[in-house]
Design a protein with these regions (language model features):
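C-terminal helical subdomain
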Residues: 180, 195-232
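Rossmann-fold cofactor-recognition segment
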Residues: 49-67
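Conserved glycine-rich cofactor-binding loop
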Residues: 13-15
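Residue(s) in the substrate-gating loop at a strand-loop-helix junction
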Residues: 140
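Conserved glycine-rich Rossmann-like NAD(P)H-binding loop of the short-chain dehydrogenase/reductase
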Residues: 29-45
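Conserved mid-core segment of classical short-chain dehydrogenase/reductases
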Residues: 84, 90-106, 149
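Active-site helix of classical SDR
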Residues: 120, 156
Length: 247
C-alpha cells in the first residue's frame, strides 16, 4: 500500500482545513504543511496536529499575492513530493458594502476566484509530472445559482465551481485527483453572527464528508447530500421568485 501523501493546507487557520487535515493524519498522513499569513502564530493549530502524531511545518502564504504562488508551491513540492492539497482559504465579504464599494467587491472576487484559479493551475502543473496527488476545492451552494442577497460571493463561487469542474476533467487520467466540495451554510468563524440557513453543517461534518469522498475516490460531494436535490430545485425556480430569495 502506498504511503499517504503529505498534506498541504492553504489557509492554515481554516476550521474546515484543519478538520480535514486531522482526518488525513488519522488515515496515515505523517506530514502536514500549514500555510497562512502570520505563520509564526499557528501554535494552536500546530498543536492539534502534533497531538495526533503529525510532523507539522508552517509556511508564510498570502493567498492574494498571486505572483508568489508558483514559487511557493514549487518549493513545497520540491521538499515533499506529491501532496494532498486542501485549498481552504476564502472570504465571505460584506454584500451591502460590495454593492457600493467596488474595491471591496473586487477584493472578494480576487480571493475567492482569481487566487483560487492561480493556486489550482500551479498545483495541476506541478503534480501532473508526478502523476500523483490530490486537490480539495471548496465551492458552495451559493454558486449553484447566484442570489440577489449575496451575488458577489455567490458569483465568485460559481466561477470557481466551473473552473474546478473543468480542471477535474482536464486532470482525468493524469494520476492527479480533484475533489470538488459543495457545502451549504457552515456554522463557524466566517458565519459568526449570522442565522444558520436550513441544512447547515459544522466544519467537522464537512470534513467527515471530504474524508469519505477522498477514500472512495469520488470527484465531487455535496454537504449534506440532500443539497444536490435543493440545487436542482433552485435551477428551475422562476426568476421573479428567485430574486426575492434570502441568503
Amino acid at each position: 500500500m502506498a504511503h499517504p501523501n503529505p498534506v498541504l493546507v492553504l489557509g492554515g487557520r481554516s476550521e474546515i482545513g484543519l478538520e480535514v487535515a486531522e482526518r488525513l493524519v488519522r488515515a496515515g498522513a505523517r506530514t502536514v504543511v500549514l500555510a497562512a499569513r502570520r505563520s509564526h502564530d499557528l501554535a494552536g493549530e500546530t498543536a492539534r496536529l502534533t497531538a495526533l502524531g503529525a510532523d507539522v511545518e508552517t509556511a508564510e502564504f498570502d493567498a492574494d499575492d498571486v505572483g508568489a504562488h508558483e514559487g511557493f508551491l514549487a518549493g513545497v513540492v520540491a521538499r515533499h513530493g506529491a501532496v494532498d492539497a486542501v485549498v481552504a482559504f476564502g472570504v465571505l465579504g460584506d454584500q451591502a458594502r460590495a454593492e457600493h464599494d467596488v474595491a471591496h467587491a473586487l477584493a472578494v472576487v480576487h480571493t475567492d476566484f482569481v487566487a483560487q484559479v492561480s493556486v489550482l493551475s500551479h498545483l495541476a502543473n506541478l503534480l501532473r509530472p508526478l502523476r500523483a496527488g490530490r486537490v480539495v476545492v471548496f465551492s458552495s451552494i451559493a454558486g449553484a445559482r447566484v442570489r440577489r442577497a449575496n451575488y458577489v460571493y455567490g458569483s465568485a463561487k460559481a466561477g470557481l465551481d466551473g473552473f474546478a469542474s473543468g480542471l477535474a476533467d482536464a486532470l482525468h487520467g493524469s494520476g492527479v485527483r480533484l475533489l470538488l466540495v459543495r457545502p451549504g451554510f457552515v456554522v463557524g468563524r466566517m458565519t459568526t453572527g449570522m442565522s444558520p440557513a436550513p441544512l447547515a453543517s459544522t466544519p467537522a461534518q464537512v470534513a467527515d464528508a471530504v474524508a469519505a469522498a477522498l477514500a472512495a475516490g469520488r470527484g465531487e460531494v455535496w454537504v449534506p447530500g440532500t443539497l444536490r436535490a435543493l440545487a436542482a430545485a433552485m435551477a428551475v425556480t422562476p426568476r421573479p421568485v428567485w430574486r426575492r430569495a434570502p441568503r
